[in-house]
């Protein structure tokens, strides 16, 4: 539940037992346990529709209800809460929430009415209707796209494992270029659980969404939309159809589309037995290798690529995992993977880690279920200290040119001075407003007058400068002219 909340959802709906402080006897959410502090939606604020007893008991001067605490969270947790102020019966609860959702999705479309108007439209004078209140701004509209993409098609009509499908459509919300998101979901799963209670056996049946088979981004330059998806081997082979979900937006408008008639089937086997390529980058896109440095407060970018695509189904044993080898604990991060724009082979995970010394192992699977692992050790730099790390030049010795590479902890101005062994400065190179992290600088091996320098050993000094700090380092370079 918390993962779904923090990832972003439009509506949180609950019907069942509860109180002003918790949902369900099993403590699905518990205010006294501090669960509100674990909700981190950011600006992705959902509407809560909670059909349970007294969840929104706002007129109790002695204590605060869960609904009140949710709505008080600054830019977090909830945009509004619709819930009860008193105990409510099961039938009344069910009837009212059913009426509310019928008003929200009137005639199988999303209502354009303000939420306060929707709520008022189903107030029928019954006690159950009187118990439900809106905590929030009644003039707000539903956080669900009203517009739809049109003429959405996918070909072929049956998608086979390890093969690609092409989707097309028309958007009419913007005349400019933009981008959107696309997901392919496996068939819904019918679940039945049996419980033995006091020598009686009870069954509970429900439906869960199918596994995510693809999750990516696409771009468009006009009204037409098109892109590709790839199907993994790990499908359910259900007779039910799969779904394609699409979403686009600009600053003012958003639109969505669903195709829920896609058939999936087994495809041809592959001879590919190589797993994905795994690499690491900083937030500037610079590739990181063992013992490199990551700037303080920067996330680590984990890039994963494979010609057959990456397995995103989260099937047991086929998840994308990150193991913190310092703590010997693992996280399943499959849901954090997103394909690059217009790609069906390469994507990334934006991983937040604050360790001073980073030691991770990443494991991922391609769509043919070939695994790969990659381990890396990194050092975290201190943001308030200007330092230069890992200064090298290559080739060294050099003939006609060489390239200097180095890491700097903060944005900086650079000055490179090259000296003879006698202390004479023969060349200076300056660069300004360079970004923190890994940088390179080329030198053609000539002096300040563009003359070739003599064979021999030289010393260079690298200076990184900020307004208040200066850091420099001396290194030896050798020149060989034939």
Q: What positions do the PLM features span?
A:
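Catalytic-core segments of thiol-dependent peptidases
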Residues: 1-61
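Active-site-proximal C-terminal subdomain of hydrolase catalytic domains
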Residues: 51, 55-156
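Short, compositionally biased P/S/T/A/G/V-rich stretches that sit at domain boundaries
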Residues: 134-170, 265-298, 305, 381-397
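Beta-strand-rich binding/interaction modules
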Residues: 162-200, 314-317, 414-418
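Long, low-complexity serine/threonine/glycine- and acidic-rich segments characteristic of extracellular
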Residues: 183, 190-264, 282-285, 295, ...
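A structural signal for beta-strand boundary/capping segments at domain termini and interdomain linkers
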Residues: 255, 369-373, 425, 450-452, ...
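C-terminal tail/sorting-segment detector
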Residues: 377, 384, 451, 455-482
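Glycine-centered coil/turn sites that cap beta-strands in beta-rich domains
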Residues: 379-422, 428-432, 440-443, 464-471
